């Protein structure tokens, strides 16, 4: 097992020969950048002497657990992509961390980020997920990042919705290509809350094939500069925004007119019910509705008496059930 230790740093590090007056311990205390990428490292040992470390490169290794970083209170950049990490943990003391790279691991839930009050970039693309599973997001972690996170990469994670990310209102860049996003209305709702969004990559998602997909997102994301790798022309954006505003303005009066007509009909029906069918105003309105127009032929009125058959087969006139029928000819 290859472990990252101070001895390995001494062996492979760049302790300058010209600094012979400086001890190795002093060198470690002053160290700010440490690059041990692609060294087959499986575990991080105690590096607490490197108290001023700000950038740590550990990508392309065999690390299975994030550990022993509690000393690195000054760390701002952590690169641990392409390892065997399955859980985001032990990062609570990294209060200055602004960029975290964890792509290409085996993480199933984005969690354990509640104490990262300075995190601006999070990269968790291309996780090695079990068949049929998608990357999930812990609400507490997402809520804690709502005022700081600007750049998020969640591409290639079988994600089919973005509701959980709605609180991230400081977002400027979202990379979510090669997922299973399909609901254009959901995306419009989420992105309408991200007023600072400048770059959006949803390429190779099912939603890209929806009618007017590009037009709808450009309209709702009013400051978007780049969509799916294509620049957005300012004139085109303004045209789409104006077109939507005009369409909405025309729709409102029609909706209002329909609503007024519906209310009037309801009031008329209600009034007739309370007045009763024999009220003069009701009879007048009823007769006006049945009156033929000038272009119609006058009706011929027939009186028919309901014939009631007696037990002998003969008909008797029922005066009490006299009906009137009108026939147009």
Curated annotation (Swiss-Prot):
LRRCT domain ranges (all copies): 205-243
LRR repeat intervals: 30-51, 52-73, 74-95, 96-117, 118-139, 148-169, 170-191
GO-annotated molecular function: actin binding; dynein complex binding; tubulin binding
Coiled-coil regions listed: none
SUPFAM superfamilies: L domain-like
InterPro entries: Leu-rich_rpt, LRR_dom_sf, SDS22/Internalin_LRR
GO CC annotation terms, alphabetical: centrosome; cytoplasm; manchette; microtubule cytoskeleton; microtubule organizing center
Annotated Polar residues bias: 318-329
Region (Disordered) residue spans: 268-329
Keyword Transmembrane helix: no
Location in or out of the cell: Cytoplasm, Cytoskeleton; Cytoplasm, Cytoskeleton, Microtubule organizing center, Centrosome
Keyword tags: Cytoplasm, Cytoskeleton, Leucine-rich repeat, Repeat
Cytoplasm keyword on record: yes
Protein purpose: May regulate phosphatase activity of protein phosphatase 1 (PP1) complexes.
Protein name: Protein phosphatase 1 regulatory subunit 42
Organism for this UniProt entry: Danio rerio (Zebrafish)
Gene (name only): ppp1r42
């Amino acid at each position: 097992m290859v472990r990252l230790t101070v001895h390995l740093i001494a062996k492979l590090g760049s302790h300058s020969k010209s600094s012979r007056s400086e001890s190795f311990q002093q060198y470690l205390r002053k160290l700010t950048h440490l690059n041990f990428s692609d060294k087959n490292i499986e575990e991080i040992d105690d590096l607490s002497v490197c108290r001023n470390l700000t950038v740590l490169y550990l990508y392309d290794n065999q690390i299975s657990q994030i550990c022993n970083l509690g000393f690195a209170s000054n760390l701002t950049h952590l690169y641990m992509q392409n390892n065997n990490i399955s859980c985001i943990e032990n990062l609570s003391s990294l209060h200055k961390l602004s960029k975290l790279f964890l792509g290409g691991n085996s993480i199933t839930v984005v969690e354990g980020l509640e104490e990262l009050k300075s995190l601006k970039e999070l990269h968790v693309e291309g996780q090695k997920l079990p068949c049929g599973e998608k990357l999930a997001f812990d609400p507490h972690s997402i809520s804690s990042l709502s005022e700081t996170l600007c750049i998020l990469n969640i591409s290639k994670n079988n994600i089919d919705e973005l509701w959980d990310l709605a609180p991230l209102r400081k977002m400027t860049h979202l990379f979510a290509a090669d997922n299973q996003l399909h609901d254009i209305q959901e995306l419009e709702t989420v992105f309408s809350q991200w007023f600072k969004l400048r770059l959006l990559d949803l390429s190779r998602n099912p939603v890209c094939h929806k009618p007017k997909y590009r037009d709808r997102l450009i309209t709702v994301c009013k400051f978007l500069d780049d969509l799916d790798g294509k620049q957005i022309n300012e004139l085109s954006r303004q045209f789409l925004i104006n077109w939507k505003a005009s369409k909405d303005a025309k729709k409102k009066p029609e909706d209002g007119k329909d609503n007024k007509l519906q209310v009037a009909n309801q009031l008329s029906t209600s009034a007739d019910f309370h007045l009763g069918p024999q009220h003069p105003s009701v009879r007048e309105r009823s007769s006006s509705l049945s009156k033929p127009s000038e272009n119609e032929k006058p009706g011929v009125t027939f009186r028919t008496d309901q014939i009631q058959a007696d037990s002998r087969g003969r008909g008797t006139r029922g005066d009490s059930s006299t009906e009137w029928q009108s026939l147009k000819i």
